[in-house]
Amino acid sequence: TQDRSSAASDVYKRQDFLLSNLNGTNKISNKDLEGDYILNVWASWCITCMVEHPYLSKLSKNGIKIVGLNYKDDRSDALVWLNKFDNPYDLIIHDFKGTLALDLGVTGAPETFLVNNGKVVAHYQGEVNQTVWNEVFQPIINSKNLSLK
């Protein structure tokens, strides 16, 4: 586990982007992402993403706001994957070339960021599960009194 939240937060704070949603029907910019939320980097080709997916679905069903960043993935493969395994994301950004992910310092999938009003306050590389949630994310959510709903 690595926490590069300080470096990533600076980049994320000033990073303007305009990418399409996963369906290709709308454009999404940094201005569309407000408040507190989880940003999860995932791909249909990522085995570990499949392992963590049920936990993300559980978080989503509990009202946690999750934005998906679909990373270097084929749009149709990703849509099929979500139809098969459930869609826990409130919004999905399709980052086919990986440009936004690169700007965030992403080295692979899955990676998960906790975002507080446009600033990354936590960054986890690897599978998010109950233990990671309790040890990495929940203490920050509690200390900053974040509302992820």
What label would you give each PLM region?
Residues 1-8, 12:
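Single conserved hydrophobic/aromatic residue that forms the stacking wall/gate
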Residues 18-27, 91-95:
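Short gly/ser/thr-rich secondary-structure transition/capping motifs
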Residues 28-50:
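Short active-site neighborhood of thiol/selenol oxidoreductases, capturing the structured segment around
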Residues 38-39, 66, 112:
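Hydrophobic beta-strand anchors of alpha/beta hydrolase catalytic cores
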Residues 50-85, 96-102:
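Structural microenvironment flanking redox-active thiols in thiol-disulfide oxidoreductases
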Residues 84-88, 95-141:
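Thiol/disulfide oxidoreductase modules built on the thioredoxin-like
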Residues 146-149:
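Non-globular targeting/processing and membrane-anchoring segments
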